[in-house]
């Protein structure tokens, strides 16, 4: 049976798919209306219509394909191939949004260049994004579409015939004058955006991710918002595309901000702010999955620090640059876009070497702190002490640009951009402990992340290993490398995921008397260096006793975190 399944997979990969591509190339001259939108060789008509959840049983001979797709794409890629490229979506806007009329012919509301950066995307998801874009965006609201392939290197994107197919398909069915740039080497999100922006012709730029689906009326509110006031960056509400069923799910309106560790937080809107919905509201932290911005302004602020490399840098620096140049970030509830955001744990698997990711993010944060935060950097280093030992590199150019723009102090950012958020713990709380997490039995062994197994293990302690520098934070999670948290798996083994600050399996307490680390009702225990798990608490069990380097007992006691 396994041999048969393997033969079927090979036939599809090397015979069916190439033949399908060849047929598509032959049919590219036909009208889209007569073909009903290239369903794809595996799609099921009607599946996922109106953004509904899709359910299909996976045949036994396709289990391997299903599993491998999950491991790489971080969502149900097997199902994604079976949902038509063109599907309807629900209109989840407030009823008042649907009645609004925008002066789209005014001189102030300029059309945009729409820019998409992608790398190693699943073809059907990318094409579904593009179809939803062109079919739900009036042509007079944008003058060009720029697609930048940041040196994709998976099987499909490495094949010349596949690139020909993609380019021809886009020009025939998406936009006849779309500009497609296939970069010869990977440059990263920030540089790819800057490159595309330098090529753009419109007075406004709209950047979009490759894993989104657009709803009716998404673009007009964004362009209207940036037309009303100069130096405005506008973002939509990002709804959720479920990674298992691809269902379109409504998100509630929230406000982005940064805490003292420069970690992004989503906090509820105040009652006063909610009473003014669905009108736009200002936020402190931008989400760059979809955003609109005046082109000249973006060019002015795009080259602050060319040495930042992705992974948490783009959104953080852009938020600061907007504030520095007298701008504002505005969330627009009348604009809604579905976003396929995989679970954090799966997201980690895709990028592999977590140690390098942690080093990269730490260096990014160090550069941003040294350039932007001024007198308050000591407060931030208190939450990120491991950054003190990291080299930030040459900062002459970003500091020069910072001074040229006459940026105000970081205190002004806190006071001006985050008013009314003082009730949020992130702004004024102190963490409970930081440093190494060691076993009392083997005090030279420290809790460390294993990027390959997705588990945690014990390794010889090192002051230079950023993946051993833990913080028991004010929100009672145990985090490392800025935004990675220890998490209890359903099988009670200890793993990790990106922090969500919502408790649950990421909630931790420390008992300084018994030296036990507790998550909910169970205690952290080890049997050897590779086996760390949660078990019934036993104060007499030496393998449940842990040491945290720097414990703030007074804060623990005042917060009643001590058990």
Swiss-Prot record:
Stretches assigned to the Cytoplasmic side: 1-6
GO cellular component: Golgi apparatus; Golgi membrane
Upper classification of the organism: Eukaryota, Metazoa, Ecdysozoa, Arthropoda, Hexapoda
Alphabetized InterPro entries for the sequence: GalNAc-T (IPR045885), Glyco_trans_2-like (IPR001173), Nucleotide-diphossugar_trans (IPR029044), Ricin_B-like_lectins (IPR035992), Ricin_B_lectin (IPR000772)
Residue span of region Catalytic subdomain A: 109-225
Matches recorded under PROSITE patterns: RICIN_B_LECTIN
PANTHER family documented for this protein: N-ACETYLGALACTOSAMINYLTRANSFERASE (PTHR11675), N-ACETYLGALACTOSAMINYLTRANSFERASE 4-RELATED (PTHR11675:SF134)
Family of this protein: Belongs to the glycosyltransferase 2 family. GalNAc-T subfamily.
Ranges that cross the membrane: 7-29
Keywords on record: Disulfide bond, Glycoprotein, Golgi apparatus, Lectin, Membrane, Signal-anchor, Transmembrane, Transmembrane helix
Lumenal compartment residues: 30-563
Localisation per UniProt entry: Golgi apparatus membrane
Signal peptide positions on this chain: none
Glycosylation-annotated residues: 50, 389, 428, 464, 469, 552
S-S bridge residues: 97-334, 446-461, 485-499, 523-537
Topology term for the membrane: Single-pass type II membrane protein
Record note on domains: There are two conserved domains in the glycosyltransferase region: the N-terminal domain (domain A, also called GT1 motif), which is probably involved in manganese coordination and substrate binding and the C-terminal domain (domain B, also called Gal/GalNAc-T motif), which is probably involved in catalytic reaction and UDP-Gal binding. The ricin B-type lectin domain binds to GalNAc and contributes to the glycopeptide specificity.
Entry keyword Transmembrane helix: yes
Stated role: Probable inactive glycosyltransferase.
Record-given protein name: Putative inactive polypeptide N-acetylgalactosaminyltransferase 12
């Amino acid at each position: 049976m396994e041999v048969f399944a393997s033969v079927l997979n090979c036939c599809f990969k090397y015979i069916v798919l190439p033949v399908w591509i060849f047929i598509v190339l032959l049919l590219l001259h036909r009208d889209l209306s007569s073909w009903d939108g290239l369903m794809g060789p595996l799609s099921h008509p009607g599946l996922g219509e109106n953004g509904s959840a899709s359910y299909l049983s996976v045949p036994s001979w396709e289990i391997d394909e299903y599993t491998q797709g999950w491991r790489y794409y971080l969502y149900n890629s097997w199902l994604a191939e079976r949902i038509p490229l063109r599907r309807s979506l629900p209109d989840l806007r407030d009823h008042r949004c649907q009645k609004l009329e925008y002066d789209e012919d005014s001189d102030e509301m300029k059309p945009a260049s729409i820019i998409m950066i992608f790398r190693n995307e699943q073809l059907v998801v990318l094409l579904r994004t593009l179809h939803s874009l062109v079919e739900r965006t009036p042509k007079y609201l944008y003058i060009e579409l720029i697609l930048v392939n940041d040196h994709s290197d998976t099987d499909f994107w490495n094949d010349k015939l596949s690139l020909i197919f993609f380019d021809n398909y886009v020009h025939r069915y998406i936009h006849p004058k779309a500009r497609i740039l296939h970069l010869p080497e990977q440059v990263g999100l920030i540089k790819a955006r800057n490159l595309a922006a330098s090529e753009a012709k419109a007075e406004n730029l709209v950047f979009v991710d490759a894993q989104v689906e657009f709803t009716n009326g998404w673009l007009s509110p964004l362009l209207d918002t940036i037309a009303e006031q100069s130096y405005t960056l506008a973002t939509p509400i990002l709804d959720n595309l479920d990674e298992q069923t691809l269902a379109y799910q409504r998100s509630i309106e929230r406000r982005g901000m940064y805490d003292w560790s420069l970690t992004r937080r989503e906090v509820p809107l105040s009652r006063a702010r909610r009473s003014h919905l669905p009108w736009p509201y200002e936020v402190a932290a931008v989400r760059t999955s979809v955003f609109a911005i005046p082109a000249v302004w973006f060019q002015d602020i795009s080259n602050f620090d060319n040495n930042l490399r992705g992974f948490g840098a783009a959104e953080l620096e852009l938020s600061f640059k907007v504030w520095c140049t007298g701008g504002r970030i505005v969330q627009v509830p009348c604009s809604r876009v579905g976003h396929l955001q995989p679970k954090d744990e799966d997201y980690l698997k895709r990028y592999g070497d977590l140690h390098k990711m942690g080093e990269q993010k730490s260096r990014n944060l160090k550069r941003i702190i040294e350039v932007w935060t001024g007198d308050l950097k000591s407060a931030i280093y208190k939450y990120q002490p491991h950054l003190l030992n990291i080299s930030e590199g040459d900062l002459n150019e970003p500091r020069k640009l910072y001074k040229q723009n006459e940026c105000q102090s970081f205190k002004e950012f806190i006071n001006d951009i985050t008013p009314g958020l003082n009730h949020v713990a992130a702004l004024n709380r102190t963490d409970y402990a930081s440093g190494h997490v060691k076993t009392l039995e083997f005090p030279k062994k420290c809790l460390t992340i294993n990027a390959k197994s997705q588990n945690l293990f014990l390794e010889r302690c090192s002051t230079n290993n950023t993946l051993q520098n833990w913080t028991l934070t004010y929100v009672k999670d145990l985090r490392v490398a800025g935004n990675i948290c220890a998490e209890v798996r359903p099988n009670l083994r200890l793993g990790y995921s990106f922090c969500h600050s919502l408790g649950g399996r990421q909630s931790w307490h420390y008992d300084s008397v018994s030296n036990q680390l507790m998550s909910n009702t169970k205690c952290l225990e080890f049997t050897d260096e590779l086996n760390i798990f949660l078990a019934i608490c036993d104060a007499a069990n030496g393998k449940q006793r842990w040491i945290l380097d720097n414990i703030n007992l007074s804060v623990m006691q005042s917060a009643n975190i001590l058990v």
